[in-house]
Amino acid sequence: IVGGKTAKFGDYPWMVSIQQKNKKGTFDHICGGAIINVNWILTAAHCFDQPIVKSDYRAYVGLRSILHTKENTVQRLELSKIVLHPGYKPKKDPDDIALIKVAKPIVIGNYANGICVPKGVTNPEGNATVIGWGKISSGGKQVNTLQEVTIPIIPWKKCKEIYGDEFSEFEYSQITPYMICAGAEGKDSCQADSGGPLFQIDANGVATLIGTVANGADCGYKHYPGVYMKVSSYTNWMSKNMV
């Protein structure tokens, strides 16, 4: 997360750290995710190397720091299923979204809980918040404590123009109607924030998941907002697959 601040532990209990086994056999944080319910997590498809080996990945919830996976608030979750959206193709992205089923249900409490998902297709506007353990500048260092930043949602037509022809060397130059763009100069999601939640909190304090971090250009680059998969466009696919 670029331009953000450290989140208060427990403020965002739906946040997930997705970790991948490295050559030493230990696990590194690679992506964020959001708890949808006790069995399912939503994340980005590009987090997983294909062909997928489920045992190479784990999810952690209730983390204060990605270094401290043994604290008593933490649940370490093995994965029983990884469902990539059928429209997703590696290195190209219309449908960079994936569901993870955990092997044992998540125990709900102060530090682990689901986030609401939109009921129908919505067109969010105004500001939204994105959180993650990703880098704090493009190619920069990763942080151990969860970061949060509030960013403006960019109107879709404007975003499509921004990522026009001249910029097609970026993977995400194809801005589809199933995407949301958000971000301002110096405030953005970044590498290793992928899959994490973009959400809005209403006057009653209820949070709704509106996007998952896809990619976008260099982090926090002034003219180019971050790109998110629009969750409300995928709720039918989600409910069909969360079985």
UniProtKB/Swiss-Prot annotation:
Tissue and organ expression note: Expressed by the venom gland.
UniProt function note: Acts cofactor-independently.
Source organism of this protein record: Agelenopsis aperta
The record's account of how the chain is modified after translation: N-linked glycan at Asn-127 consists of Man3-GlcNAc2-Fuc.
Family of the protein in this entry: Belongs to the peptidase S1 family.
Stored CDD domains: Tryp_SPc (cd00190)
Disulfide bond sites: C31-C47, C159-C181, C190-C219
Taxonomic lineage: Eukaryota, Metazoa, Ecdysozoa, Arthropoda, Chelicerata
GO CC, alphabetical: extracellular region
Pfam families: Trypsin
Localization terms from the record: Secreted
Gene Ontology BP terms: proteolysis
Glycosylation site positions: N127
InterPro entries hit by this protein: Peptidase_S1_PA (IPR009003), Peptidase_S1_PA_chymotrypsin (IPR043504), Peptidase_S1A (IPR001314), Trypsin_dom (IPR001254), TRYPSIN_HIS (IPR018114)
Complex formation: Heterodimer with venom peptide isomerase light chain; disulfide-linked.
Enzyme category, top tier: isomerase
Gene Ontology terms for molecular function: isomerase activity; serine-type endopeptidase activity
Protein name per the record: Venom peptide isomerase heavy chain
Keyword Membrane: no
Keyword Secreted found: yes
Active site, per annotation: H46, D96, S194
EC number: 5.-.-.-
Keyword annotations from UniProtKB, A to Z: Disulfide bond, Glycoprotein, Isomerase, Secreted
Domain Peptidase S1 span(s) in chain numbering: 1-243
Extent of the signal sequence: none
